[in-house]
Amino acid sequence: HRKNAGQSRAIRSGILAARAPVIGTLDGDGQNDPADLPDHYRQLTRADAPESLKMVMGRRTKRKDTAWKRFGSTFANNIRKRMLKDDCDDAGCGVKALYRDSFLQLPYFDHIHRYVPALMRADGFDVEYRDVNHRERRTGTSNYTNFGRLADALSDLRGVMWLIRRRRNPGGMDEL
């Protein structure tokens, strides 16, 4: 991108440019450990994985963030988890392995990266969660604050709830 277009746009652009059927994502600040991706890939593509499993997502343990940031994240995750019923404890974790075609079926909007598990489930897909490492930030500064994220999060949450209520899962398609 010629200018910063946000995390969700960066993820979508990368996935659009990719050609592999399975995509791995990480945040760009160095806090996610790339060593976690092979495990996610193996879980997603294992022989006994249900056909409906389309994403394996990280759940950060031993977070290397301030107590205030951890509090804000836990508070927000509990609200969104309760409202969206997606069982996602850590929507902000960037470590994901997912099927490209399943992700591209989702409606795009800014900040979608926090709602991918809920939207995947609304489309009838399964999502699994795995514990991942979390490291000190190695580059850049956070563009988020607890209060700054709150207004966007409340608006986005209402929008995602609206989208989910209106999505019709056909339960698959058969060729005629």
Regions found by a protein language model. Give the residues of each.
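Acceptor/aglycone-binding surface of glycosyltransferases and processive sugar-polymer synthases
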Residues: 2-17, 22-25, 34-114, 135-162, ...
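Catalytic donor-sugar/metal-binding loop of nucleotide-sugar-dependent glycosyltransferases
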Residues: 108, 112, 118-135
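Juxtamembrane C-terminal module of membrane proteins
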Residues: 167-176
